[in-house]
């Protein structure tokens, strides 16, 4: 399944979008793809992050917790990186 990753910094209205393939990907592969997509992004505590699957389902997080990696984003949003990835891969 394909998905679009979106990162919107509401402070300066910067929007970054990346495409990602979710089907048949391990949890680690999905995490790595997300980290790579936003690695150079200027994330702040006013950043909105979401993944929109091709079937229209959106998974949303309203804050990037320490501005550096997707790992901290997952912990901030759901407490469990495995659960978060499993949810949007379904």
Predicted features, each with a name:
Residues 25-85:
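Acidic, low-complexity, intrinsically disordered interaction modules
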Residues 8-10, 21, 54-56:
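Short amphipathic alpha-helical "recognition" segments used for binding
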Residues 14-25:
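A short, exposed loop/beta-hairpin motif centered on an aromatic-Gly-Thr core
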Residues 1-2, 87-90:
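Short intrinsically disordered terminal tails
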Residues 1-14:
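Short aromatic-glycine-(Arg/Gly/Cys) micro-motifs in beta-strand/loop hairpins
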Residues 3-5, 20, 71:
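Intrinsic-disorder/low-complexity peptide segments enriched for small residues
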């Amino acid at each position: 399944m394909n998905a679009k990753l979106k990162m919107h910094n509401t402070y300066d209205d910067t929007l970054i979008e990346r495409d990602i393939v979710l089907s048949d990907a391990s949890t680690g592969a999905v995490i790595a793809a997300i980290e790579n997509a936003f690695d150079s992004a200027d994330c702040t505590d006013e950043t909105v992050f979401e993944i929109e699957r091709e079937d229209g389902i959106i998974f949303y997080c309203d804050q990037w917790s320490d501005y550096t990696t997707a790992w901290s984003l997952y912990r901030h949003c759901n407490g469990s990186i495995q659960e978060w990835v499993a949810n949007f891969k379904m």
